[in-house]
């Protein structure tokens, strides 16, 4: 029978619940178990696809085209599994499905209520995560903190799961804060005690406490927490601030968290072989070289807006034993007068995805600087579209080349809306989303980056595409279309062969990068800076 691990948080947000869930998933996977992870987000939006990056951070896209929370990126990078639509569920999605069923008459005239209809739908999503992946263990993280009004239906559903599947088949892990007060020179357990009290008031007794802390928790304090929170002392696990997020699996393993979970489930599994992970960490902590990358984007004020791009750049650096230092640069601030001064000294330039008209001219100036000065350049999604426009304006002589996203009535729209996107009423969930094949042109830098495969699979999130009316003209001027859809209708990758590295992709390669398996384009990009 499938086992269920529920991860909740208390005291404050951003304690690292997602990293704890992902780290435990990695430990259990390395013990030979099939693991999947999901997150429940208590906001009313159906998904984060229409939310501002300043509000939510990056929108992570899964193979099946689901727009999800950025924590799913952590999950995939840690457990190296591709997740699906059941791995991210919001309050909006739950209520939408319940209301759809009610409209179809599937509740047979019953009064639709939070209990049982909403909680049953939540439990159904937990079960579907198990059945669609045939997993031995499902790890479910609940967003927010205990005490939030929005989280109550999810916590009630978790409480009911104990009766539905049996106490021996589910375990509750609660992450809390054990703050260190410098003025007093001591750590405080009261926030943890009150958080557990709140959780128990809802009907959930945690089995494990993961305590976020700056310093090691002394044994006497560990015993105190165990006594007041009614857990075993070995179930009080500290999660200290670490040099790298990839330290956390080993920190948790050294405290026996995976053993405790399996013992609770009465499961036996081989000891986790963490050799590859340990070797990777050794590389991360002993990087010798340094490369400086300029990330020219629109949402740089929030680091989480480009978290997968930043991680993918670091992953690529590990291959070359190099610490990749990423400097975010606001594209709005770049002008003709300051572009050279702003970008001088960088080993590479990357322009990631985005939407809208703000900052586009600064991106185009940055791309022009990279092309003319032979600075390695990688464009992603919007970065590919702006690279096409820059080439058209400054090489092909189409000085008014633009994008239909900003100027829908312009004469020379190098980038235009996809034909199947023109008459859509809804914005949410209607873009070209998910995994699609890309046919590579032999002999290109792009094909070389992917070990000369003829076709690759990549994740997408876009509504606009390269306008094929200009393909022949730009080809004549030296632009190479290195990747297309298999039917040759959609341009996926462009490159300039004369440059050391000038490649731009419509897809999002960052979503498939792993710390121990860097994505091909990122690896080639960093390689070109060596």
UniProtKB/Swiss-Prot annotation:
Binding-site residues, L-glutamine: 54, 354, 382-385, 405, 463
EC number(s) on file: 6.3.4.2
Active-site residues, as the UniProt record annotates them: 381, 508, 510
Sequence positions that bind CTP: 13, 148-150, 188-193, 224
InterPro entries: Class_I_gatase-like (IPR029062), CTP_synthase (IPR004468), CTP_synthase_N (IPR017456), GATASE (IPR017926), GATase1_CTP_Synthase (IPR033828), P-loop_NTPase (IPR027417)
Keyword check for Magnesium: yes
Activity control mechanisms: Allosterically activated by GTP, when glutamine is the substrate; GTP has no effect on the reaction when ammonia is the substrate. The allosteric effector GTP functions by stabilizing the protein conformation that binds the tetrahedral intermediate(s) formed during glutamine hydrolysis. Inhibited by the product CTP, via allosteric rather than competitive inhibition.
Pathway assignment: Pyrimidine metabolism; CTP biosynthesis via de novo pathway; CTP from UDP: step 2/2
Keywords: ATP-binding, Glutamine amidotransferase, Ligase, Magnesium, Metal-binding, Nucleotide-binding, Pyrimidine biosynthesis
GO molecular function terms attached to this record: ATP binding; CTP synthase activity; glutaminase activity; identical protein binding; metal ion binding
Positions with a binding annotation for UTP: 13, 188-193, 224
Domain Glutamine amidotransferase type-1, first and last residues per copy: 292-530
Quaternary state and interactors: Homotetramer.
Family of this protein: Belongs to the CTP synthase family.
Role description: Catalyzes the ATP-dependent amination of UTP to CTP with either L-glutamine or ammonia as the source of nitrogen. Regulates intracellular CTP levels through interactions with the four ribonucleotide triphosphates.
HAMAP family: PyrG (MF_01227)
Miscellaneous comment in the UniProt entry for this protein: CTPSs have evolved a hybrid strategy for distinguishing between UTP and CTP. The overlapping regions of the product feedback inhibitory and substrate sites recognize a common feature in both compounds, the triphosphate moiety. To differentiate isosteric substrate and product pyrimidine rings, an additional pocket far from the expected kinase/ligase catalytic site, specifically recognizes the cytosine and ribose portions of the product inhibitor.
Designated name of the protein: CTP synthase
Organism, scientific name: Latilactobacillus sakei subsp. sakei (strain 23K)
Organism lineage string: Bacteria, Bacillati, Bacillota, Bacilli, Lactobacillales
């Amino acid at each position: 029978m499938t086992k269920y691990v529920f991860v909740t948080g208390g005291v404050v947000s951003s304690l690292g619940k997602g990293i704890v869930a992902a780290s435990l998933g990695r430990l259990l996977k390395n013990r030979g178990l099939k693991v999947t992870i999901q997150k429940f987000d208590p906001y009313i939006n159906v998904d984060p696809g229409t939310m501002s990056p300043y509000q939510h951070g990056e929108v992570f896209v899964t193979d099946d085209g689901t727009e999800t929370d950025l924590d799913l990126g952590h999950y995939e990078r840690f457990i190296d599994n591709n997740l699906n639509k059941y791995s991210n569920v919001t309050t909006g999605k739950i209520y939408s499905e319940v209301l759809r069923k009610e409209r179809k008459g599937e509740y047979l005239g019953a009064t639709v209520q939070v209990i049982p209809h909403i909680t049953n739908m939540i439990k159904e999503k937990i079960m579907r995560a198990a059945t669609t992946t045939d997993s031995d263990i499902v790890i479910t993280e609940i967003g927010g903190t205990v005490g939030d009004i929005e989280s109550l239906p999810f916590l009630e559903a978790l409480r009911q799961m104990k009766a539905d599947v049996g106490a021996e088949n589910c375990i509750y892990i609660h992450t809390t804060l054990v703050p260190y007060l410098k003025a007093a020179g001591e750590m405080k357990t009261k926030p943890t005690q009150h958080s557990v009290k709140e959780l128990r008031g809802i009907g959930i007794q945690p089995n494990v406490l993961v305590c976020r802390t700056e310093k090691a928790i002394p044994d006497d304090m560990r015993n105190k927490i165990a006594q007041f929170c009614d857990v075993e002392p070995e179930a009080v696990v500290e999660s200290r601030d670490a040099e790298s997020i990839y330290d956390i699996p080993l920190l948790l393993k050294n405290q026996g968290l995976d053993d405790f979970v399996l013992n609770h489930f009465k499961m036996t599994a081989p000891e986790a072989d963490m050799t590859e992970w340990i070797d990777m960490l050794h590389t991360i902590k002993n990087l010798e070289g340094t490369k400086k990358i300029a990330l020219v984007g629109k949402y740089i004020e929030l680091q989480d807006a480009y978290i997968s791009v930043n991680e993918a750049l670091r992953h690529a650096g590990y291959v070359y034993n190099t610490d990749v230092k990423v400097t975010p640069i606001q594209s709005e601030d770049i002008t003709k007068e300051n572009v050279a001064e702003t970008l001088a000294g960088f080993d590479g330039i990357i322009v990631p995805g985005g939407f809208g008209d703000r900052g586009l001219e600064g991106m185009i100036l940055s791309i022009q600087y990279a092309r003319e000065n032979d600075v390695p350049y990688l464009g992603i999604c919007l970065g590919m579209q702006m690279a096409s426009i820059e080439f058209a304006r400054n090489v092909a002589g189409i000085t008014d080349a633009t994008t239909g996203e900003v100027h829908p009535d312009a004469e020379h729209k190098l980038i235009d809306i996809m034909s199947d996107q023109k008459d859509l009423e809804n914005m949410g969930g209607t873009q070209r989303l998910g995994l699609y094949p890309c046919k590579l042109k032999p002999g290109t830098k792009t094909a070389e980056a992917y070990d000369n495969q003829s076709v690759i699979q990549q994740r997408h999130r876009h509504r606009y595409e390269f306008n094929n009316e200009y393909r022949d003209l730009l080809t004549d001027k030296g632009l190479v279309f290195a990747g297309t859809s298999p039917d040759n209708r959609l341009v996926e990758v462009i490159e300039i062969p004369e440059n050391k590295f000038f490649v731009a992709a419509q897809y999002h390669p960052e979503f498939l990068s792993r710390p121990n398996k860097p994505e091909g384009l990122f690896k080639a990009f960093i390689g070109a800076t060596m």
